[in-house]
UniProtKB/Swiss-Prot annotation:
The gene is uspE. Gene3D superfamilies: 3.40.50.12370. Belongs to the universal stress protein A family. This is Universal stress protein E homolog. GO terms for cellular component: cytoplasm. Transmembrane segments: none annotated.
Length: 309
């Protein structure tokens, strides 16, 4: 996967503009045959400009434009800073009180293939701080969304792909392949990148063992684990991934995935996201929000190209 048309969401309160820095670095490490387009989007709004009943709609529109031009001048500094002959850099400043709506409208009206946005990283906390705007974007955005916490790619560049190898639904196998292919492509684009796979499988229901004393808990769990291991082996062999780069563990995805990401010091976690039931992952049911809230690394959220019925 090579990104050709990237939308970067600027953060007006972050002078370092990590999202733009990360996007530019990603493009620089791709082997591009043609120029890559990066659009820096900034959503601005000031309620005080809407409060005056004395202003005509024309006057209000003119004031909006003045504010936009002021911010456009400030954004130009970053376009100049990251100028690169391989990149067509441009800015788009919009007046909108809802940043998430502004982003989604921009995506709907243009052929972007990636959105990059900075999300807060508190030193005293062990996870990223996702804002309501971040959640809305991950839920609704139809294209991949890269949430970053800083501006550079670390070495070694370990990419952890979360997959569902339960084999319960056919579309999951196709989606697993999409996710792994994305991870491998990014690893190839990012020098010294390597891919790990992770899958979680459930424990035996406690109430089942209580209600059915004859129920073989150990046999059930061994069977579930065995099936996940077989399916994971088939997936990793399909892509030539080493066995020691696959992780199949008992537990909830929201515990297993962040745990493995921390252990291998993952630079990026790739998750599947499906917006029809809030934010969820096809591989994770409705637990993706819990997974994401516990991650301390960058996140790439991807929706399946083929929707499940």
């Amino acid at each position: 996967m090579k990104f050709k048309n990237i939308l970067v969401v600027l953060n007006p309160s972050n002078e370092k503009q990590y999202a733009l820095a990360r996007a530019v670095r990603l493009v620089e490490e791709q082997k591009n045959e043609t120029k890559v387009k990066i659009t820096a989007l900034l959503s601005v709004y000031d309620l005080s400009y809407e409060m005056s009943a004395l202003l005509s709609s024309e006057e209000r529109s003119e004031m909006h434009q003045q504010v936009i031009e002021k911010h456009r001048h400030a954004v130009q500094y970053y376009l100049d800073k990251y100028a690169n002959p391989e990149i067509e850099l441009q800015s788009h400043i919009v007046w909108n009180s809802n940043e998430a709506d502004a982003i989604n409208e921009e995506v709907e009206n243009n052929n972007y293939d990636l959105v990059v946005k900075y999300t807060k990283d508190e030193e005293k906390l062990t996870s990223l701080i996702f804002t309501p705007i971040d959640w809305q974007l991950l839920r609704k955005c139809p294209i991949p969304v890269l949430m970053v916490r800083d501006g550079d790619w670390k070495h070694p560049r370990r990419i952890l792909v979360a997959v569902n190898v339960s084999g319960e639904q056919e579309y999951q196998d196709e989606f697993n392949q999409e996710l792994v292919e994305t991870g491998i492509s990014l690893a190839e684009n990012l020098n010294r990148g390597n891919v790990h796979l992770v899958a979680a499988y459930p424990s035996a229901p406690i109430n089942m063992a209580i209600d059915l004393p004859e129920f073989n808990t150990s046999g059930y769990e061994n069977g579930i684990r065995g099936q996940h291991l077989i399916n994971m082996k088939a997936l990793r062999q399909k892509f030539g991934i080493d066995e020691d780069h696959t992780h199949v563990r008992e537990g909830f995805p929201e515990e297993v995935i962040p745990e493995v990401a921390k252990e291998i010091e993952a630079e990026l976690v790739i998750l599947g996201t499906v917006g029809r039931t809030g934010l969820s992952a096809a591989l994770l049911g409705n637990t993706a929000e819990h997974v994401i809230s516990k991650l301390s690394c960058n996140l790439l959220g991807i929706k399946p190209s083929k929707k499940d019925d």
